[in-house]
Amino acid sequence: MSNKIQVFAIPTGLLFLSLFIFVKTQTTTAEDIVTNKEQPSVQNNSDIGFIMRITAQGFDYGAQLGADVLYQKLKHMNYIPDLITKQNGVEMTITNLSIVDFSPPVGYAELIPDHGVRWILSINHTKVSGYWNYITRAWFTFQDEGSFLAVLHETILNITIEITRSSYGGVVMTVSECESIINLEMNLGSWLYNIVASLAQPFLENILQSQLCDIATGIIKVDAMSILEKLPVNITFQNNYVMDYSMLEPPYFTEDYMETYHKGEVTWKDDKEGIPFKPMPLIPLIETDRMLYLQISDHVFNSYCYAAFSHNMLSFEVTNDNLPGNILSTTCESGGLCIGRLLPKIGEQFPNESISLSVFNNLSPHWTFDDTIQLNFKGILNFNIPLKNGRNVSIFMIELDLKAHMSAVIKDSRLYSQIVKFTFKTINRKNSLYGENFNFYPLTNLVIKKYVIPRINDQGRIGIPLVMMSGTMVVNTELKIQKHTLTLGTDFEIKHL
């Protein structure tokens, strides 16, 4: 039996089984996974910045979760249509049908290359009770009635799901058919009654097949849909930034996994110009050992920085109000450290004043993934003294080239970063008090440690959001850094749906 189901669109870049996924890990290093069988990815679009792979293990786990949902729905199934059939002068009526006992369904998935997924459900045994009544009219009338208990020794449901990309970057899923195999044994107590029952048995099988298919496909169309609709294609964060997770290509299926390919780009909200550069190709993923893999391009970070840079969000003023201990004072407190002690000439010429530091970028900060995560920050440090008499004195200007090595952390559906070490170079661009060869390293090092690094880490602590579902615990997790590619591999356990 095949039931044709309508096509429905889903406004998200993830397949329905991804509703069982939530990333929650705090590890930053792990051993690389090695496999002997290479699994090529399909990446035809140069805009891909984010790839998700759900493996056969992940689909099997999700298929069993769906089977558990079916089990709960069958427990509360309280209506099966009555059956009335008339054949060869015999009218058979079956009423008050009810499922009185059944074994928990077992679910697993079968990936169909270049097509989609088949959700297979197996119910080992089911018992259905009801009342029967038959009447035959010829040159005499004979009728009888009674109760019965029918046994389904094994029931198999095969639900085929076709998956493609919608016009707006979400997913379109079509439940193309539900095939069911039912082995029904119906015993009314005597050979004569069983002959009569055999007339109704095919019709009863059809009713049960239809009911089971309706419930199972409803899990996809209603339960999965309600969760998927909460997973957006675009996420606005920090009020002004938008992460675009729209799907760029149809999902790619092999027997071992499904991959989806996404934009993975951060832009300024309502900015029509977009990002003027594209992501570099991601390293082909060969692993299939975990249930889920996420590949994140360094383009995600670079587009985020460009959006901030192009809207002047990376320029800022630093005064004593921003730093501890009055470090920018030209006259130090007793026993304290300040710029007047680091550079005595400033303290002598401008006593009891406070320096204002302007920090701005020449270029957008640049992230590079290549075995490690590195951030390159090029900017200008401009030191001024706003005198109490109202005059503003420009002291010196330093060009800064900062290279910072970062750690990456994925926790609570966000990708976080933090500087773990850094190096920098300076160029003396403007200096009214000191010679060209003056060493500004101690001062620059102080400013970087006390303000620039904390400022960058503050942004890293905000994190970049990932489209995931809460309520899941991940296990057996690894985070791997390769050229332009950050790869997260994990298994997961669902505590509740």
Regions of interest found by a model, annotated:
Residues 4-7, 22-127, 185-497:
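Extended, low-charge, aliphatic-rich alpha-helical segments
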Residues 7-15:
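Sec-dependent N-terminal signal peptides
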Residues 16-22:
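Hydrophobic h-region of N-terminal signal peptides that target proteins for export
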Residues 86-156, 160-177:
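Eukaryotic helix-linker segments that join adjacent hydrophobic helices
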Residues 139-140, 148-150, 169, 178-180, ...:
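Short, low-complexity, polar/charged sequence segments that are solvent-exposed and flexible
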Residues 157, 179-182, 494:
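Solvent-exposed loop/turn segments at secondary-structure junctions
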Residues 173-189:
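A short, charged helix-loop
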